Design a protein with these regions (language model features):
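An acidic-aromatic pocket/loop used at catalytic or ligand-binding sites
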Residues: 1-30, 55, 68-195
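Acidic/histidine-rich, surface-exposed loop or edge segments in extracytoplasmic proteins
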Residues: 38-52
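N-terminal accessory/precursor segments of enzymes
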Residues: 29-39
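Stable alpha-helical elements in mature extracytoplasmic
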Residues: 58-66
């Protein structure tokens, strides 16, 4: 996770603001007495990170640089790493969204753009678009809940600038989320249930 965040940090036009790391282990949900969806695991552990960046300049200048950094193949692609035309989750779609003002030629709203790859997602402020998005401040670190055995939450740097202050400085905030389904950090440690 740190390596990918560092690679994104080297993209011209992005300034790292903060990263929130979460590591937790829990007993899987096995449903109610009326459901038969017993997990094959007794314990699962997963990590997630959300890195916040200030965008210097226009996001449409930065998106091609993110693609050129080869952090992931963003969205569906055809041969030789070319984005599938009109496919969501790609840099090409995101650039078209901004160029067209978030509307199809017939006036319909386009779906909001993000960059997506297995276990990775990039999103950003789109404050003046038909489907606005505003990156929020990171949520407070949650306490250990029932079913959760362990949770560690940390922020780097220890005393970061707020997202609101970063937005005032840079104009646009971008988030890079790592973890979840498709990530090597999802269920990175499991304890199988004995049969």
């Amino acid at each position: 996770m740190r390596t990918l965040i560092e690679r994104l940090s080297t993209v011209e036009g992005l300034e790292h603001v903060l990263t929130r790391f979460t590591d937790s282990c829990a007993r899987p949900y096995n449903g109610s007495i009326f459901e038969n969806n017993r997990s094959p695991y007794h314990l699962t552990c997963s990590m997630q990170a959300v890195a916040y960046f200030g965008v210097r300049g226009d996001i449409t200048d930065v998106l091609p640089r993110i693609r050129a950094a080869h952090i992931a193949n963003w969205g569906p692609q055809v041969s030789e790493g070319v984005d599938l035309p009109h496919a969501g989750g790609t840099v090409t779609y995101a650039l078209t969204y901004h160029r067209e003002g978030g509307r199809c030629p017939d006036g319909r709203l386009m779906s909001a753009p993000t960059l997506e790859a297995p276990g990775l997602r990039i999103d950003w402020d789109r404050l003046h678009m038909p489907l606005p998005n505003r990156v929020e401040e990171p949520a407070a670190c949650l306490p250990v809940e029932s079913g959760c055995i362990y949770r560690r939450c940390s922020t780097v740097p220890d005393a970061p600038m707020s997202v609101a202050a970063a937005r005032t400085r840079y104009g646009t905030i971008l988030t890079f989320t790592l973890g979840g389904w498709g990530s090597t950090a999802y269920h990175y440690f499991t304890v199988p249930r004995r049969k």
